[in-house]
Amino acid sequence: MPSILIVDDEPGVRSALGGVLRDEGYEVDAVDSGEACLERLGRQAYDVVVLDIWLPGMDGLATFARMRERQIESQVVMISGHGNIESAVRAIKMGAFDFVEKSLSLEKTVLVVRNALRQRHLEAENQALRAR
């Protein structure tokens, strides 16, 4: 079962998005900070991380940079309630799969997560073929 980690400091976002993704059949965990995200990723691999840009403490872009330094291979979907084009462009240049603005359209977010999972599957398949 595909696994998703939601990282957002707003309990309502974690609850609503987590509920919809669970209804889609995904295994979902949620944390409220960048630090908690990195700690969780140190213990468990996730296929997709839905990561808020504006987090208290370590923000989402810094968290994403640390994920890349640690070579964590999860697909990352960045979300933000402060639709800042500069942040979106920076996240995509860093390797984020996509950027979704809050107020989250749950249908759009599910579609983006589904596409990120498809991309993750293709990358894993490609690596397996290269290893032969």
What are these regions (language model features)?
Residues 39, 61-73, 90:
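Short amphipathic alpha-helix used as the core "switch/output" element in two-component signaling
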Residues 33, 59-62:
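Acidic catalytic/metal-coordinating carboxylates
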